[in-house]
Amino acid sequence: MSRVAKYPVKLPSGVEVKLEANKLTVKGGQGTLSMTVHSDVTIGQEEGQLTFNPSESAKSWAMVGTTRALVQNIVTGVSEGFTKSLEINGVGYRAQASGNTLNLTLGFSHPVEYKLPEGVTAETPKNTTIVLKSADKQQLGQVAAEIRAFRPPEPYKGKGIRYGDEEVRRKEAKKK
């Protein structure tokens, strides 16, 4: 049984929640996000917080816990937003953000242009650091994974694109 679902989601000031049938819409300072709620979950709104209750089926507690976690991420996203940083290691590897396009020089014979989706912004404080910001946590992680996939870090020299908090396990080179 999920213990996550037993705790309500507190709504910070400036966040509006609208429930219609099985669609939840949350509006805040960072934007508006919506999600469809599973049929086994009922959401109640009272005194600045959301509560979650399961239906009668045995497996509905799992969906209640999942739904509560997703709603918590949406509320945090529209009130504070999420950031994810990427670091680029390698000689001549660099990034430059211009508008909604990210230009990457990653050792290929051509520069890589990545068009950022709606709702995600990128900054490059240094030419080896990319800071991504979004209200949608899932979309932010997907964009970061797609950028990292252009040149994932390799274990011998550590060259490539890695997440800011990622530790790359290094291997020793072959000895003669």
From Swiss-Prot:
Compositionally biased residues, Basic and acidic residues: 153-170
Disulfide bonds: none
Highest taxon listed in the record's lineage: Bacteria
Keyword annotations of the record: Ribonucleoprotein, Ribosomal protein, RNA-binding, rRNA-binding
A Gene Ontology term for the protein's cellular component: cytosolic large ribosomal subunit
Presence of the UniProt keyword Cell inner membrane in the record: no
Biological function: This protein binds to the 23S rRNA, and is important in its secondary structure. It is located near the subunit interface in the base of the L7/L12 stalk, and near the tRNA binding site of the peptidyltransferase center.
Family, per entry: Belongs to the universal ribosomal protein uL6 family.
HAMAP family found in the cross-reference section: Ribosomal_uL6_B
Protein name per UniProt: Large ribosomal subunit protein uL6
Species in which this protein is naturally found: Chromohalobacter salexigens (strain ATCC BAA-138 / DSM 3043 / CIP 106854 / NCIMB 13768 / 1H11)
Highest classification ranks of the organism: Bacteria, Pseudomonadati, Pseudomonadota, Gammaproteobacteria, Oceanospirillales
Gene that specifies this protein: rplF
